[in-house]
Amino acid sequence: MPVERMRMRPWLEEQINSNTIPGLKWINKEKKIFQIPWMHAARHGWDVEKDAPLFRNWAIHTGKYQSGVDKPDPKTWKANFRCAMNSLPDIEEVKDKSIKKGNNAFRVYRMLPLSERPSKKGKKTKSEKDDKFKQIKQEPVESSFGINGLNDVTSDYFLSSSIKNEVDSTVNIVVVGQPHLDGSSEEQVIVANPPDVCQVVEVTTESDEQPLSMSQLYPLQISPVSSYAESETTDSVPSDEENAEGRLHWQKKNIEGKQYLSNLGMRNTSHMLPSMATFVANKPDLQVTIKEESCPLPYNSSWPPFPDIPLPQVVSTASTSSSRPDRETRASVIKKTSDITQSRVKSC
């Protein structure tokens, strides 16, 4: 059997009364107030024999240290002593009288009499724990559900309605709270064993006011088209007359017994490029040559000259009789067009 050792409070009283440890003494013996030297080990002048004998004696008393066998560890001795002091219910520290810094640091403690000791909390029986658990379990159920099993928000919504129709989904019982549309009296059905839970369904007629939809609350708004967008649209989109005129040139062709519609060679280039026609009409000194390519090439600065093919059409708005050379590249036409446009803009 393990040897019973003395508890910490009587052991401390014995150490104080022995007067063998420097700095450990009574401040007020009647009130059981005493001080313990508590100098930090990192301070200059700290000594094991002078500043840590109380902690070493407690380690020997608890069997954590044996002189000549174990290696001295003052830090662990002090930590174990502090934990033991804090765990005692009948000893408390007087913090306003303690000095924890400096070479003469110490802590002041007071031994509480029996009347001032805190009473131990008794353990609760199993029946008390079960009753408390049931009470905690029932509280959220009662607070979150109403009579019909609906939460408070839903029940408030249904109570605010003027007329309700209660429908039981299990036994098909209908209790109508208003007369029928033909003016007949109210019909009531009595059942011997009505169910406990009923589903509440709201039924509305065509005469009832329907809630406003999102489109009625927020009408659709279309911002006006800017002048820039209008001018761009008129230049790029052909009119209805131009589309109708373009559709008149469709011809039927029969290839290998199959019918096809074709307008090759019949379409007017002014309808194909309405934006170009508008662009050319405002420039009297501009002449644009349109050519068809069998194999389009990528747009770059090194365009080869076009082969000698007859020009399909020449669009000109000027009355001048000047002629252009047949071999004129597209890059030169675009460059000239940009030069003319820049000159007209600067002159304006």
Swiss-Prot record:
Main localization category: nucleus
Gene Ontology BP term (one): immune system process
Bias (Basic and acidic residues): 125-137
One GO term describing the cellular component: nucleus
InterPro entries, A to Z: Interferon_reg_fac_CS, Interferon_reg_fact_DNA-bd_dom, IRF1/IRF2, WH-like_DNA-bd_sf, WH_DNA-bd_sf
Biased composition (Polar residues): 314-323, 339-348
Keywords, comma-separated and alphabetical: Acetylation, Activator, DNA-binding, Isopeptide bond, Nucleus, Repressor, Transcription, Transcription regulation, Ubl conjugation
CDD domains reported for this sequence: IRF
DNA-binding region per Swiss-Prot/TrEMBL record: 5-113
Chain positions with N6-acetyllysine modification: 75, 78
Presence of keyword Lyase: no
GO molecular function annotation: DNA-binding transcription factor activity, RNA polymerase II-specific; RNA polymerase II cis-regulatory region sequence-specific DNA binding
Region feature Disordered, mapped onto this chain: 117-137, 311-348
Presence of the UniProt keyword DNA-binding in the record: yes
Cross-link Glycyl lysine isopeptide (Lys-Gly) (interchain with G-Cter in SUMO) residue location(s): 137, 164, 291
Location(s) in or outside the cell: Nucleus
Subunit comment: Interacts with CREBBP in growing cells; the interaction acetylates IRF2 and regulates IRF2-dependent H4 promoter activity.
Family: Belongs to the IRF family.
Role played: Specifically binds to the upstream regulatory region of type I IFN and IFN-inducible MHC class I genes (the interferon consensus sequence (ICS)) and represses those genes. Also acts as an activator for several genes including H4 and IL7. Constitutively binds to the ISRE promoter to activate IL7. Involved in cell cycle regulation through binding the site II (HiNF-M) promoter region of H4 and activating transcription during cell growth. Antagonizes IRF1 transcriptional activation.
Protein name per its UniProtKB record: Interferon regulatory factor 2
Organism: Gallus gallus
Gene: IRF2
